[in-house]
């Protein structure tokens, strides 16, 4: 959730650190800070509460802080309130050790009490300060190397961490360690870079190392050495990131979110082209063999947030096409309920970042039970990608806005192609149906583009909703899955209370919430359910609701009851989610803009939820 950057090289560090932190703002934060070393001098630490621009102003955009080695951090408060005092970096009592940290140290109070007995004092409420002083304690006690001191400290820490640490005795070096919290290291032109996510360093290098779980690294100028927690050197392969640095910039758009909405046709096309070869779906790079697919008796889709909504839509498609029972679960619930998994099942973990804490824990629980796993992730080399038995990479590219758009759309494509291929291999569809589904999928990017080009009507409608108190989304079947995502988009960026309901459940209590003027958005993309959902909408209108209908071209009778109608191109009903979600993304976006809110960085939210 927080962001970490680091740099050691020939250039001045502070401007690079601030630039890197700006690329991590989407992760969410309430304060920020940097620490820079100028040769053998003590580290200069500058911290600020609030937006990164406050820190930039305090440092004259980094120009007033001299030194070629440094670390930086954006903090999301977990231990201690948002304040300059609690912001990172933190230092030992004598300034010997300075560090930044992502994660949660669960036994920090126990460790803190021990350090107080040893004479240490504490100025903040954070668990990070405890880690810094614990490392300092072991560094002085054993008079060993930084790697030794870090190792002694980490074996006593319970919880998750990504640490970037500087030692006074090693002025041009940074030491890194991680457990269950992401970190990436890059090298270029005799300089080294550290980031908790790829965009932080993408401007400077595409040559990166992925530090593994419970590993450490010694970062020098253009040189990185890796260690296990026993202090033994280990080898790492240098990887090349394919993402374009331009993709992490706004490129003339007002917000990242609207840019990423516009990027969806290409992202969907790229993801389709990655698995469709000569008109056929090829899952060889995903890793699942035909024999394994034939043996699957149950599919468990486990995810959080929007990725969970992908799973809800995928359940309908997978069961319809492949005739395999599918269970969709929230990762935060799955990991704690002692699940009973079929040994011949397949657990599918969906996560844009590949680092979502609950999803990663669910993956590990599944592997512990010996069940085959598949990760659908966007970030290459992420924890889920490395630990899953098989991985399906979506090609959304960097997604900066907190509210997902293109990553969601590419996850849907992954689900569709898996369902179609599973159905073919298991003999549930004919060759003609197989080809027909693939051909229809290949029309999706162009149809998304057509919807985006007609956004002005939605922009006008959104401007009328800025004072809405409640908005309800209703649908049946796949339309319910669409409603879930539309509702989340609305509430997370416009701050309007919004809920999604299965339309058939309205009469079981929900309809009592309808008042005069309450906006009810009905999603009607499934032909066999159209009349039933329309009937539910009419029932809402009779109680004073203001209706918006979202359906496919041709269903113009919706206008007899809806106060505002939105149409999407026709497609196979199984794939309707890919089209119907676009107007709902645009609606949430334009309502937020009309209210003057921070679209890309909504309050209290983080892009990558890497702690519980």
Role assignments for model-derived ranges:
Residues 127-130, 310, 314, 410-415, ...:
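Catalytic-loop motifs flanking and including active-site residues across diverse enzymes
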Residues 7-10, 101, 121, 125, ...:
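Hydrophobic alpha-helical scaffolding
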Residues 1-250, 254, 266-297, 336, ...:
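Conserved short alpha-helical segments that host acidic/polar catalytic motifs at enzyme active sites
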Residues 231, 546, 561, 571-612:
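Generic C-terminus detector
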